[in-house]
Amino acid sequence: MDWQTERGQVLDSARRVVIKVGSAVLTSGNGLDVGVVDNLVAQIADLHGRGVDVVLVSSGAVSAGRAVLRRCCEIKGMPHKQAASAVGQSRLMHYYDEAFGRHGIISAQILLTKDDLRSRHRFLNARNTFAALMDWHAVPIVNENDTVAVRELEFGDNDSLASLLLNVVDADLFINLTSAGGVYADNPDTNPDARVMECIENVHGLNLDVMCGGKTAVGSGGMYSKLLAARRAAQLGVPTLILPGRKPDAMLRAFAGDEPGTWVRPEKKTVSARKFWLAYHADPTGSVVVDDGAVKALEAGKSLLPAGIIGVEGGFGRGALVRVTSAAGAVVAVGLSNYPAADLRRIMGHRTAELTAILGDNQYPEAIHRDNMLMDAVV
């Protein structure tokens, strides 16, 4: 199937959509751009009327708070940013609530940190909450809980949060609204002739550092993070549509076939929801370095055995999420380690038959089982 046919079929059949909108779309120099917000809400109401469930991931709290506080307070450092978020979040939600109310739609606020999705029990609670809200035909409005999040509990940006929610709500489409017209084939800041790519066939094959100038250059929430989120969505089998968020009715025009944006195709071989959760529920706490033979075995679908390990980095415990890297430093996979780092250092390079003599009875033959590993993880 060609991508145009795929896109048309998905847009016609989509029944659950995660829409992400960032601060660059929602705000102007004077704070919240109410015209943009009103148009966004009107488009979501239109989709709602067609029977499409929508989860809205919305940034803008910090920017809205800054607009209120700038006359009296200087905002600098993380505590001030978190305080500005507290001021802005209530104003942002108040406006959303009124805007959706004008269309007869109930909105609901959900604030999350990584810790809320790290525990399988809390992950399932979150899933049930979203399901109940959508059964009531409400629109969940999600943001990272900036006020309480610390570095190790941050999603990093709302693009990452939105990609993880695809798995929570079983979405069949991811729409990412940006201040650009879509994804450019080259950096438009340095190449004025750069054009928007209407389709990305293989998002994993893109060199993001070249296209986006690297993560540092574009900053949190730039095109770099949007394409990383699209990579995760593609692994889950969910296509991504990147659209110009400040352009009036861009989503409705896209559903009508009149607004191209950039369509990111999903992978043909997708990962299970469980593996997706295992790989992305937490940040890796260490690394296991493997030889070329082990890399080939993993690519063939095998588990990682201690014999293929040539190095261990970090001080993680049993069951921790770790990176699997090649000798050259490339990330091959992430997975849950059957052994703490100290034990892995003792058994690395040894054959399975030797493990009992080194560590005692009842040892796992695998350092990381293939069922607990995700290849080509986006970390």
UniProtKB/Swiss-Prot annotation:
Keyword Kinase: yes
Domain PUA, residue spans: 285-362
Localization, UniProt: Cytoplasm
GO CC entries: cytosol
Cysteines joined through disulfide linkages: none
Enzyme Commission number: 2.7.2.11
Keywords, sorted A to Z: Amino-acid biosynthesis, ATP-binding, Cytoplasm, Kinase, Nucleotide-binding, Proline biosynthesis, Transferase
Alphabetized GO MF terms: ATP binding; glutamate 5-kinase activity; RNA binding
Segments passing through the bilayer: none
NCBIfam families assigned to the protein according to its UniProt record, in alphabetical order: proB
Full protein name: Glutamate 5-kinase
Gene: proB
